[in-house]
Design a protein with these regions (language model features):
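ATP/Mg2+ or Mg2+-diphosphate-binding catalytic cores
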Residues: 182-223
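Active-site acidic catalytic loop and adjacent metal/ATP-binding pocket
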Residues: 81-130
Length: 223
């Protein structure tokens, strides 16, 4: 969606959902997945793909593009993992239930004029900031990482559910992580290398093309 009003509505609906979910404490025996360990695993996958490409005598179109850009994405991933580790070690993060896949496809506008989250199959114990980061990332990718879009989403969320300094730092670290690049790398790593999907090549080329806009946003958003 490109409508600011729609994005604001989705963001408010997410905040309302988080307000409800945090009323239900997690059982003491439930383990919450480590965010920094997850980020480190994804960084390791980038390095693994890089090493695979280095061993090849001839690279294809995807591998050529990957090798052009992997260093800066890997650097972002490592920095994100470092911040996530710092936050998790501080013991200040409060886990609760999360939607798990909150994007424009999982929030609907009802006939009564309300925005409601749907499709809760992916709900899991975690940190609510991960839902907000996923929603912001999806919307920013569709809007050239426009700071006005980011501000609109964040302001709408905070009008319903406030974020303290720790939550903001977590959100920033999650947005810093090169999630889309890792997703493309993982898809390629699990595919047949003898046949390169043109769609993957196009997606990576587009990601590189838009990386300047993303980095400009991160420059002002990450403190």
């Amino acid at each position: 969606t490109d409508s600011i009003d729609d994005m604001r509505g989705g963001s408010r609906a997410l905040a309302q959902l988080h307000n409800i979910l945090e009323k239900y404490p997690l059982p003491s025996d439930i383990e919450v997945e480590s965010l920094h360990e997850k980020a480190q695993r994804k960084c390791a996958q980038i390095v693994k793909l890089k090493n695979y490409i280095l061993r090849r005598s001839k690279t294809n179109a995807f591998e050529h593009l990957f090798y052009e850009c992997y260093e800066r994405f890997l650097e972002q991933g490592k920095k994100s993992a470092e911040i996530l580790c710092e936050l998790e070690n501080s013991k200040t993060l409060v886990p609760t239930y999360c939607h798990g896949a909150f994007n424009q496809h999982n929030v609907v506008y009802t006939q009564s004029g309300r925005w409601l989250p749907v499709n809760f199959e992916t709900m899991h114990p975690g940190y609510p900031e991960t839902d907000l980061a996923e929603y912001m990332r999806k919307m920013l990718e569709k809007n050239h990482w426009d700071t006005a879009v980011a501000d609109a989403i964040l302001d709408s969320y905070c009008s319903v559910r406030s974020l303290d300094d720790t939550s903001m730092r977590l959100l920033q670290a999650l947005l810093l992580f090169p999630e889309k690049f890792c997703k493309l790398c993982n898809h390629y790593s699990n595919s047949r290398k003898s046949w390169v999907c043109d769609r993957d090549v196009d997606k990576l080329a587009q990601l590189i093309q838009l990386s300047g806009e993303r980095e400009e946003y991160l420059l002002h958003a990450i403190v």
